[in-house]
Amino acid sequence: MSFSTEHHPGVDTEPDAATRGFVFNHSMLRVKDPAIALDFYTRILGLRVLRKLDFPEMRFSLYFLAHRPPDDAVPDDAGERTAWTFSQRGVLELTHNWGSETQADFKYHDGNAQPQGFGHLCFSVPDLDAAVAWFDQHQVPFVKRPDQGKMKDVAFIQDPDGYWIEIVEPARLKKLGC
């Protein structure tokens, strides 16, 4: 069966040929301390660092992370690896502005408090109960557990910078919104 888009007001059902080949590559979060953020995203959520880029003249670093198989062929050449990183799908970019990690009261706005803006990232997992147990074992803070609230079988955790991360098991969501 081929893909058929849902029809809603404002939806262009036939994307222009000029957009063929466009790929959603990454979304970016600003982080206070890259060591803490990288530990969370690699150890707790299983992402791998694809590339780090430093910009000393502007005093910031970019870390690009994604889920990749261990046997994935990654270019050794720095330029080729950068180009490869920007060709991937589902990448998370963490931006660290140098010095923020030493400011005790420094905090980024997560977008969920007023004024609202950015909401959350979402990770799908094969077993929601096992994921919840994993997060509990590692003392990851929950915003919402799967059995709380009106929307069941959906969890929200927080990363070290307070950003919300939705955790879902796709098979449990078949009746969502029905």
Language-model segments: residues:
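Short, contiguous, helix-prone interaction/anchoring segments in small proteins
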Residues: N25-R30, I36-D39, L45
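Basic side chains
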Residues: R30-K32, R51-K52
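Conserved active-site tyrosine of GNAT-family acetyltransferases
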Residues: A37-T42, L65, F135, G162
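Short glycine-/small-residue motifs
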Residues: I167
